[in-house]
Swiss-Prot record:
Listed Pfam families: MIF4G, MIF4G_like, MIF4G_like_2
Gene Ontology BP, a term: siRNA processing
Subcellular location: Nucleus
A molecular function GO annotation: RNA cap binding
Residues with the Phosphothreonine modification: T9
InterPro entries in alphabetical order: ARM-type_fold, CBP80, MIF4G-like_typ-1, MIF4G-like_typ-2, MIF4G-like_typ-3
Gene Ontology cellular-component terms listed: nuclear cap binding complex; nucleus; postsynaptic cytosol; presynaptic cytosol
Keywords: mRNA capping, mRNA processing, mRNA splicing, Nucleus, Phosphoprotein, RNA-mediated gene silencing
This protein's record includes keyword Phosphoprotein: yes
Residue ranges, annotated region (Disordered): 1-25, 652-683
Protein name as it appears in the record: Nuclear cap-binding protein subunit 1
Gene3D superfamilies: 1.25.40.180
Organism of this sequence: Drosophila virilis
Length: 783
């Protein structure tokens, strides 16, 4: 009997566990179904958004008792992650609030919590979308207009804070302004005087804020034909135009208007008091930007008109397109399809809007959000999906860019070159070059012939020399790159008269016999007895080794021995240039390899770039490509050491706290301590700190070298021009000052650490104002 009872008990326990698992499984299925329904609401083409919402409200209302928290979480996530469907979800919340007032209050509290957490964690876009969602709930009679205005007033209070960066004040003002298109009409009808008071406070702030950063972020230095407006100025002009139109915009879908009879009967909730978190130095706010304009209505053919630059519809369309790119940029085909599937696409010249927004992303200053090739690949997919119209719009855009290239920012010039060469390589290098032949009459340093020359150099990397020669008209012969071949002087006809030839031939013979690095070192040890000078010996040694990938790897020890001093490293770089002067790509990859193998230091590369020998190459793109990859190598090294030190300190701290907790715990609750192998010793941490400190010193030295050389050559040019009575604003000067600005902006996060040092040592008040202004604009970006 007892045995049977035990068996029955086991069966009952098994049945209980099985039923529990079944319930959990069923609940999970229901939760997944609810999430799918909420995410896809409004996307069915077979029925209207309104009928979708009615059906979903019925489903959710029935499940609120069991899945309340799940529904709250999904809806708040949708508000942040799918801002393009903001009004659909606010309508859904409004209908649920009309049926279940308690749930409406819980959702408002949940959304307020999301907004506050986003601000605290510096998730700026999420915070802005949360604020927009809360504002749109006013339209759905979920939140009272009075409490929203109180919140907006509290946010605008940030603009009156003292001793905080302007970028903080700017962001909070931008968050409020970008919310008004959704709720402005309702506030205008219900609380006009309070709304006007809010706008007046914003206007006062905008009129007094500094815009020193503006010129540093412009794509073009000229405002013809389209002004390059600062983002807050542009949005303020759009809001003022919207106010003149009585807050009536034509772009935002408002499904809640259909349900107005239901929603207006619902009770409203008041927002709690929300105070923005205070500023502290570790917070990084979004940087300002300039609104990019390429087209206006005159550029578009017959059909829908392009909204004006100061219409709020232009802002809403562009913001939506930017968000599509942000969401789908990892998959170019999906991204292109989503862009072409833009809502209301029949009401606007969509192709023009898309092309303008993509170039706005590509030319965004100080750096684009994604790699250049990301935008190029999306444009290629767009041309494939829309072959009848998009290639023509893109060609028109390219023509506009080329005609305005004279005043284009140097960084944007580089990106334009990279994009256009990549685009040509995907379309058989076909282009109507004859239409640009007027540039052949201009000076070689002028941006137009310089652009074509740099494009052909990039095309050469993506093709081969004969192909480039065949694709270009004969009139462009002077802009076509020379054949990229090595110039090894010890095999030339004059080699017999060159010092070092004997040593060079001896080394070449040994290398052909597959000698070891040690044998090469022994040969080099005999050089002093040959009677050559140090420089001659170095030239012979480095040229004989014919620096290439295999040579660098196999004879790494030899190179390290030869490159013990910075002078020797610069000598190596001189010889690389002498050997590969006609092969820019080889120069870039070889120097990159030398840096990786730590044969040359970053400071040596910077010094070499500004040497007199490189004067003829100074305005060529590849030289600055080398400088930037050098700076990036240094930056990555510092970041790596900093991360490793932080991790080690964290492990050490956790190990200490774990040890103390273990001592206090009872034997039954004792935690597993961190093992000795996992815990770094204090000596190891100290050594890591020393390494990081040394790396920071080297990084600072690198930036000091670069900026000091810029100041020297620019000051010399300005002084010489003043002495000779010539206009200093030459093509060379514009390229050089543009490269100085490019270094500041491309590496702004790292340079910012040393801004006070730079101001004290280099960018002093007695410096020429043209050079000093570049530094002041850079500092203003984070001011």
């Amino acid at each position: 009997m007892s045995r049977r009872r035990a068996h029955d008990t086991e069966d009952e326990s098994y049945d209980h566990r099985r039923n529990k698992r079944r319930r959990v499984s069923e609940n999970q299925e229901i939760e997944d179904r609810l999430e799918s329904l909420i995410l896809r609401v409004g996307e069915r083409s077979t029925s209207s958004v309104e009928s979708n919402l009615e059906g979903l409200v019925s489903v959710l209302e029935a499940d609120l008792g069991t899945f309340r928290l799940k529904i709250l979480r999904i809806l708040s996530d949708c508000a942040v992650r799918m801002p393009e469907k903001c009004t659909v979800y606010t309508t859904l919340v409004g209908l649920l609030n009309a049926k279940n007032y308690k749930f409406g209050g819980e959702f408002v509290d949940y959304m307020v919590k999301t907004f506050k957490e986003s601000l605290k964690l510096c998730r700026w876009d999420a915070a802005r979308y949360s604020l927009r969602f809360l504002a749109d709930l006013v339209n759905c009679h979920v939140i009272s207009a009075t409490s929203l205005l109180q919140l907006l007033d509290t946010i605008i209070d940030v603009s009156n804070e003292d001793t905080v960066p302007q970028v903080r004040r700017d962001w909070f003002v931008f968050a409020v302004l970008s919310t008004l298109p959704w709720v402005g009409r309702d506030l205008y009808e219900k609380k006009e005087s309070a709304l006007e008071s809010l706008l007046l406070r914003i206007e006062v702030y905008l009129n007094k804020r500094s815009k020193k950063h503006h010129n540093a972020l412009r794509v073009w230095s000229s405002d013809a034909p389209h002004p390059q407006e600062e983002y807050l100025d542009c949005l303020w002009a759009q809001i003022r135009k919207l106010r003149q139109d009585n807050w009536a915009e034509k772009h935002i879908p408002r499904p809640y208007l259909v349900f107005d009879a239901i929603l207006c009967e619902a009770l409203q909730h008041n927002l709690p008091q929300i105070t923005p978190p205070p500023h502290h130095d570790a917070i990084e706010y979004p940087m300002p930007w300039v609104v990019y304009r390429m087209f206006d209505y005159t550029d578009c053919p017959d059909g829908p008109n392009l909204p004006g630059a100061h219409s709020i519809e232009r802002f809403l369309i562009e913001e939506h397109l930017h968000h599509i790119i942000e969401t789908h940029h990892h998959e170019r085909k999906d991204c292109a399809a989503q862009l072409l599937n833009f809502p209301f696409k029949h009401k606007i010249p969509l192709e023009y809007c898309i092309v303008e927004v993509i170039f706005a992303e590509l030319f965004h200053m100080p750096t684009p959000r994604y790699l250049d090739i990301c935008y190029g690949s999306i444009l290629i997919e767009l041309c494939k999906l829309q072959p009848g119209t998009l290639p023509q719009v893109l060609a028109q855009a390219t023509e506009i860019l080329f005609m305005r290239i004279d005043s284009m920012n140097t960084s944007c010039f580089d990106r334009f070159v990279n994009w256009f060469s990549y685009h040509l390589s995907n379309f058989k290098f076909t282009w109507s070059w004859d239409e640009w032949d007027s540039c052949l009459l201009l000076d070689a340093e002028h941006p137009r012939p310089k652009f074509i020359q740099e494009v052909l150099q990039k095309c050469l990397r993506l093709s081969y020399h004969q192909r480039i020669t065949e694709m270009m008209p004969t009139t462009y012969a002077k802009l076509i790159p020379v054949m990229p071949v090595p110039n090894y002087k010890y095999t030339s006809e004059e080699a017999a008269n060159l010092p070092g030839t004997t040593v060079a031939l001896q080394l070449v013979g040994a290398i052909r016999q597959k000698c070891t690095p040690e044998e090469v070192v022994n040969i080099l040890k005999e050089i002093p007895s040959s009677g050559y000078s140090g420089e001659e010996m170095s030239d012979g040694s480095f040229n004989a080794l014919k620096i290439d990938f295999c040579g660098q790897s196999k004879f790494h020890v030899v190179f390290r021995a030869l490159a013990e001093t910075e002078e020797a490293q610069i000598c190596i770089l001189h010889n690389i240039f002498e050997l590969w002067s006609s092969h820019q790509q080889m120069m870039v990859v070889l120097i990159d390899k030398l840096l990786k193998l730590q044969i040359v230091d970053c400071s040596a590369v910077a010094t070499w770039i500004f040497s007199k020998e490189m004067t003829g190459e100074f305005t060529k793109m590849y030289l600055w490509e080398i400088l930037h990859l050098t700076i990036k190598k240094m930056n990555k090294h510092v970041i790596k050491l900093d991360t490793e030190l932080d991790n080690a300190k964290e492990k050490l701290s956790k190990a200490d706290s774990s040890s103390s907790d273990t001592d206090e715990d009872t034997p039954h609750k004792r935690k597993k301590p961190i093992t000795h192998a996992d815990k770094p010793s204090e000596e190891v941490v100290e050594r890591m700190e020393e390494k990081l400190e040394a790396a920071n010193v080297n990084q600072k030295r690198l930036f000091l070298i670069v900026f000091q050389r810029f100041i020297m050559i620019l000051s010399e040019h300005l002084l010489r021009s003043d002495t000779d009575g010539r206009d200093p604003d030459t093509d060379w000067y514009r390229w050089t000052i543009g490269r100085l600005q490019q270094v500041f902006l491309m590496h702004h996060e790292q340079v910012q650490k040393y801004s006070s040092t730079l101001e004290t040592l280099l960018f002093t008040s007695d410096l020429d104002s043209h050079i000093l202004e570049v530094f002041q604009q850079f500092v203003a970006l984070r001011a």
